[in-house]
Swiss-Prot record:
Albumin domain segment(s): 19-207, 208-398, 399-597
Compartments it resides in: Secreted
Disulfide bonds listed in the record: C95-C110, C109-C120, C144-C189, C188-C197, C220-C266, C265-C273, C285-C299, C298-C309, C380-C389, C412-C458, C457-C468, C481-C497, C496-C507, C534-C579, C578-C587
Pfam families found in the cross-reference section: Serum_albumin (PF00273)
Glycosylation sites recorded in the entry for this protein: N247, N498
Cleavable signal peptide: 1-18
Function recorded in the entry: Binds estrogens, fatty acids and metals.
Example of a GO biological process term: homeostasis of number of cells
Domain of life assignment: Eukaryota
Gene that this polypeptide is encoded by: Afp
A GO CC term assigned to this protein in UniProt: cytoplasm
Protein name, UniProt field: Alpha-fetoprotein
PTM annotation (Phosphoserine): residues: S107, S111, S113, S340, S440
A GO term for molecular function: metal ion binding
Length: 605
């Protein structure tokens, strides 16, 4: 984002280099301190998470051995009951295991040292390896037996299995899920209907796991792509909306620390991620009387639940009597004469005030508003007529809000009219045109997530559509960009993903079609029909139809609605005829080629 200067909104550079430093060069205090007393109880689960996320291919036995070894090494270097907690201790252990290092291709990273070794090992964490199978909860009877025999081993196995499949999920989130699952097992093993109890409660945990992992990976990807500056800006917005009663001094302090914690978590520094998160939550609860009246119930919870509760608590309400007039916010000061540091602090204070007076606006919309606001200030300060130049300022800022609200209304109207399946088909056509290089499975998964956004957000009251939609779309687009980072899709998607974080959604929305895409030669293999179409039901049949739709659009991206309707009608006719035939396979063999020929003639392919 151009409006954030190289010095960054909240300078975190010196603080990130040393935990012992409690103020940055702006004199912003920190809620954190340099004390890191780590006990054996802390280390066991954290070591499992750290080793498993860095080496997800490792077996549970290999991870347990590294955990045991690193704990012994920590104890040896400690004389006061506080164990050494530097990330390097864990990385040393990974590389010390030569057999493991060679077995899993770590020797290249382990031949390096310090920051280089750390970054090399981090680069391997981009995705969970294909060799790791999807996670499956054990059968209820098996779970109850194992949990009763050795609760600690059972829960450590859960932490291991979750960590290896979610390499970017923050340690506190994994531990919170583990605590929830522990309670589920205890409750369901005593229930009359164990199967039903486990099925219901596990579904909730699986949903939280999926959403939490996606969010954490998205944040880490944004930091990796855009650096800490965007993170600091979004942190100011989120904190100001959540803690609307807090003054700017408190928000600066918390933004500094929360942004730093995100970076620790994304660097794989699970111990500091956990401990510093606890310190910030403790501070927030100790100051709740001046920060927010909405977190009182959260602050009564155990630490393992506290963070999740505060993060998911409702945003605050706009303080009574507080208003913001953007055209008067600068006053009689000359923005052009501000130093870079003064501009940073001024824009940070604008973000704070605008966010706390608009607690329900999407974060991305506020980022766009701030970008436009600074651009107008820069231009008007140069004109010499600041008051007159700002006449249309509020109109220009309001356009961002109106665009987001209009899109959310349009999307929810479509969802309410079409329903899940037809809306997904509409998205499939659009995204196959934008990204025809993606596989059918990727496109179906991607558009399925879009339908999930609509089904979640459009159930809310209309004033919440925009905030919900923009927030979920940010994560959805973020994961498209993570896919693009791993293997570039096309130049249009790359441009949207890389040029501006705040404008990603706008860019993807306006990118209608990859004009560089050349359809492949027509292949009848993609349009062969068999009797399994008659046997397929529900989701399986829908997927088969959607794969056909994707192949049609890939073959002819400019496919019109009329052409699509005609092909769909012909295909439905084929299904009806052949599924009633005495020999379905013979019917498809005879009639299928006729449909393909008719379709090719109609589409000119």
């Amino acid at each position: 984002m151009k409006w954030i200067t190289p010095a960054s909104l909240i300078l975190l550079l010196h603080f990130a280099a040393s935990k012992a430093l409690h103020e940055n060069e702006f004199g912003i205090a920190s809620t954190l301190d340099s004390s890191q007393c780590v006990t054996e109880k802390n280390v066991l689960s954290i070591a499992t998470i750290t080793f498993t996320q860095f080496v997800p291919e490792a077996t549970e036995e290999e991870v347990n051995k590294m955990t045991s070894d690193v704990l012994a090494a920590m104890k040896k270097n400690s004389g006061d009951g506080c164990l050494e907690s530097q990330l390097s201790v864990f990385l040393d252990e990974i590389c010390h295991e030569t057999e493991l290092s060679n077995k899993y291709g770590l020797s290249g990273c382990c031949s390096q040292s310090g920051v280089e070794r750390h970054q090399c090992l981090l680069a391997r964490k981009k995705t969970a390896p294909a060799s790791v199978p999807p996670f499956q909860f054990p059968e209820p009877a098996e779970s109850c037996k194992a949990h009763e025999e050795n609760r600690a081993v059972f829960m450590n196995r859960f932490i291991y299995e979750v960590s290896r499949r979610n390499p970017f999920m923050y340690a506190p989130a994994i531990l919170s899920l583990a605590a929830q699952y522990d309670k589920v097992v205890l409750a369901c093993c005593k229930a009359d209907n164990k199967e039903e109890c486990f099925q219901t409660k596990r579904a909730s945990i699986a949903k939280e796991l999926r959403e939490g992992s996606m969010l954490n990976e998205h944040v880490c990807s944004v930091i990796r792509k855009f650096g800490s500056r965007n993170l600091q800006a979004t942190t100011i917005i989120k904190l100001s909306q959540k803690l609307t009663e807090a003054n700017f001094t408190e928000i600066q302090k918390l933004a500094l620390d929360v942004a730093h914690i995100h970076e620790e978590c994304c660097q794989g520094n699970s111990l500091e991620c956990l401990q510093d998160g606890e310190k910030v939550m403790t501070y927030i609860c100790s100051q709740q009387n001046i920060l927010s009246s909405k977190i009182a119930e959260c602050c009564k919870l155990p630490m393992i639940q506290l963070g999740f509760c505060i993060i998911h608590a409702e945003n605050g309400v706009k303080p009574e009597g507080l208003s913001l007039n953007p055209s008067q916010f600068l006053g009689d000061r000359n923005f052009a004469q501000f130093s870079s540091e003064e501009k940073i602090m001024f824009m940070a204070s604008f973000l704070h005030e605008y966010s706390r007076t608009h607690p329900n606006l999407p974060v991305s919309v506020i980022l766009r508003i701030a970008k436009t606001y600074q651009e107008i200030l820069e231009k008007c300060s140069q004109s010499g007529n600041l008051p007159g130049c700002q006449d249309n300022l509020e109109e220009e800022l309001q356009k961002h809000i109106e665009e987001s609200q209009a899109l959310s209304k349009q999307s929810c109207a479509l969802y309410q009219t079409l329903g899940d399946y037809k809306l997904q088909n509409l998205f499939l056509i659009g995204y196959t045109r934008k990204a025809p290089q993606l596989t059918s499975a990727e496109l179906i998964d991607l558009t399925g997530k879009m339908v999930s956004i609509a089904s979640t957000c459009c159930q809310l009251s209309e004033e919440k559509w925009s905030g919900c939609g923009e927030g979920m779309a940010d994560i959805f687009i973020g994961h498209l960009c993570i896919r693009n980072e791993a293997s570039p899709v096309n130049s249009g998607i790359s441009h949207c993903c890389n040029s501006s974080y705040s404008n990603r959604r706008l860019c993807i929305t306006s990118f209608l079609r990859d004009e560089t895409y050349a359809p492949p030669p027509f292949s009848e293999d993609k349009f062969i029909f068999h009797k399994d179409l008659c046997q397929a039901q529900g989701k399986a049949l829908q997927t088969m139809k959607q794969e056909l739709l994707i192949n049609l659009v890939k073959q002819k991206p400019e496919l019109t609605e009329e052409q699509l309707a005609a092909v769909t009608a012909d295909f439905s006719g084929l299904l009806e005829k052949c599924c009633k035939a005495q020999d379905q396979e013979v019917c498809f063999t005879e009639e299928g080629p006729k449909l393909i020929s008719k379709t090719r003639d109609a589409l000119g392919v």
